[in-house]
Swiss-Prot record:
Changes after translation: Contains 4 disulfide bonds.
Name of the protein described by the UniProt record: Kappa-actitoxin-Bcs4a
Lineage: superkingdom: Eukaryota
Lineage: Eukaryota, Metazoa, Cnidaria, Anthozoa, Hexacorallia
Keyword Zinc-finger: no
The organism of origin for this protein: Bunodosoma caissarum
């Protein structure tokens, strides 16, 4: 099956084909903050340009 939000992934196609209320689609992304980036990628709703 597909992977939902915050689930570990390797590519965009791993993520479920769903949108949030803002119309953002799930993409396989690396979460980063001031401390650096996670070692793995997760399915997250991406609001950037397609």
């Amino acid at each position: 099956g597909c992977k939902g939000k915050y689930e570990e992934c390797t590519r965009d196609s791993d993520c479920c084909d769903e949108k949030n209320r803002s119309g953002r689609k799930l993409r396989c992304l690396t979460q980063c903050d001031e401390g650096g980036c996670l070692k793995y990628r997760q399915c997250l709703f991406y609001g950037g340009l397609q």
